[in-house]
Amino acid sequence: MSIQVHDTLTAQKRELVPLEPGKLRLYVCGPTVYDYSHLGHARCYVVWDVVVRHLRARGLEVRFVRNFTDVDDKIIQRANERGEDPIALASRFADAFHEDMDALGNLRPDVEPRVSGHIPEIVALIARLVERGFAYAPGNGDVYYAVRKFPEYGRLSKRNLDDLIAGARVEPGEAKRDPLDFALWKAAKPGEPAWESPWGKGRPGWHIECSAMTQKHLGAPIDLHAGGKDLVFPHHTNEIAQSVAATSDGLHAEDFARYWMHNGFVQIDDEKMSKSLGNFFTIRDVLARFDGEALRFFLLGTHYRRDFNFSDQVLAEAERRLSALYETVEKAERLGAGAAPAAEPAFVERARAALDDDFNTPQVLGIVAEAFTEANALADRKGKKSPEEKARLAAFARGARAVGAVLGILDRPPAQALSAIRDRAAARRGIDGGEVERSIAERAAARAAKDFARSDAIRDALLARGVVLMDGPQGTTWKVE
């Protein structure tokens, strides 16, 4: 087994070799919790959830840490607007984030540190940087990182200092020695949360927070650091500078994290989703209209490093495909019940190999679709199933569930999943499920009375509204086209 990942630091695909055999330490930058999470968060955290699931399925003992940033300028601004305590506001939105992640089927991290609970570690790390000459306190209560002291600054983002200096500036009131320097500690201001430090009361800067929490919960160096590609600069670039300067004499980026992975953006009409452009969707906005597993399935249809466009139409198509998969699983499990054990289908190992190759989820979904087409044809074949055919269907169902477990899909009873997906689709179309059920009952009565003209009229009227009836051994079910 060889797992290949695209490493942002080297801009190459590399074999993922943990520092300690059999174990892997992963840090993912979590959300700044000042509002409800958006589709970009959904994409990001579904990606890293699949990474964790696959690494564990491949036998690695993964320690997964993802933080909450609950001390930040945006949180303070939002809390002041609402007259609310910043930490309380952040805690409320952290709870909402958990609800959203649960709805998407994401596993919880092993550790979820919060900045507000790690102030002593942050202060100690800043003091270490000052002591080693990589940071300075100009005397106004702030502490800054001296960027030019770190020789590999910008290596991750492929930017040199000359390029960076053109866009750098010093804000009024700042006491930077160099426009490139960035804040590690910010002096207290009225109405802001503040903690004691050797430089006076204040609060940490954004970048130092993740460095401190990574070191506390994973040590240094770690195997893998991940997040959205918007974090490459400045956040991850600054994390490297801080963490390496505090812990290593070699001053190489690998002394903090051996591998770096980044996911692409969610776009609306080829533009990055943002509030300023008015094309912003929260996870809750979408889950009010679509099933959470359908959204997850949709997100996995694009390679994690690529940007992709979101639209209701494309998501609805993903929802339809997921329903079709569940329908096939239902048939395979029902028809293969009680069959003798059979060998694992070849598509399962092909799916594993695709995930080994930089977590190629769209390729996995393509492999699964091929296998489902074959299973569907076998299940729909007329006549009694032979013991061999039953065994093949049962093996397919087990394989589908195994691949689904790594992707975080196909984990519900088919009837439950199909009903949930159908009900969301019906609500979007303004279809009353209760009314449909009453029509089905009326049609059943007409058929019992051999009034087939009435029965057909009811079926056709429902079909005209996008409702498809399916007659089976257990009665009539329905779905929305």
UniProtKB/Swiss-Prot annotation:
Gene3D superfamilies: Cysteine-tRNA ligase, C-terminal anti-codon recognition domain (1.20.120.1910), HUPs (3.40.50.620). It catalyses: tRNA(Cys) + L-cysteine + ATP = L-cysteinyl-tRNA(Cys) + AMP + diphosphate. Zn(2+) binds at residues 29, 210, 235, 239. GO terms for molecular function: ATP binding; cysteine-tRNA ligase activity; zinc ion binding. Binds 1 zinc ion per subunit. ATP binds at residue 275. The keyword Transmembrane helix does not apply. A motif ('KMSKS' region) lies at residues 272-276. Its cofactor is Zn(2+). GO terms for cellular component: cytosol. Monomer. This is Cysteine--tRNA ligase. It comes from Anaeromyxobacter sp. (strain K).
